[in-house]
Amino acid sequence: MKRNRSASSTAVKPAQLKAQGAPPQVGVGQPYSVEYYYKVQWGHQEEFLQLFLKNHYPVLEKIRGTGRILALKIETPAYHTTEDGRWDYRVTIRYKDSTVATTANPDEEAFKKELWPDQATFAQEEQRRFEILLAHWDLPVMEITPGK
């Protein structure tokens, strides 16, 4: 026997779309952390890391010097995972606040020109870094460890 359901009983209600137990948002002026994940073509992990350290890390360090970045950490997994969950490098940046994290740095282009006067080589190496990159994603994170 076929049951006929009304649209109202099977439709998703707006209240059901709200996040269940969503974490609180970071307060205004509070530090804000983002994890940046990089998945590289097999066999090119070392090349990617060398290019990242040569052409991207120095600008992050310059930005840290301005106070926009409070902490910077680069990690790689100690063990292998499944291919669909694999990532090769995670860069965690703790920004001064969420506004700094989500707006363009007005000094970044000047830093790049200062650090790499040969812009043609810089552009070529950055292009190569992205050619060997399979995936990249950003994950804002919040610490929720209870206080003592």
Model-derived features: positions:
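Acidic/histidine-rich, surface-exposed loop or edge segments in extracytoplasmic proteins
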Residues: 28-43
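Polar/charged side chains located within well-ordered beta-strands of beta-rich proteins
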Residues: 35-36, 56, 91, 129
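Sec-dependent N-terminal signal peptides of Gram-negative exported proteins
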Residues: 1-21
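Short amphipathic alpha-helical segments
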Residues: 44-71
